[in-house]
Amino acid sequence: MTNSISVIELQQKIDNQEDFMLIDVRESFEREHFNIGGLHISMQTVFDRVNEIPKEKIVVLYCQKGIRSMIVIQRLSERYGYQNLINLQGGMDAWLKMKTQ
């Protein structure tokens, strides 16, 4: 089971300046349209760049809808033993919806 965080909880982490890492697993063209920051490691390159993903701090991964980031988390957990990865529920779609309300 993948750990997840809501957009409201993520906003609170950002506001409280908590120590965590943010990773966008979308493609470059999606990120250019809109992003909330963090390191960009597309789903296609994540295993080539696994050494950039720490195991000693919380890492929140996001994509457009929360599906690709969930898949990446499952694969990283299975292959490399990560236990510190959290999926942003609803991804950028949920983030944009929250910001427009």
Regions flagged by a language model, labelled:
Residues M1-M21, V25-V60, K65-Q101:
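Rhodanese-like catalytic fold shared by cysteine-dependent sulfurtransferases
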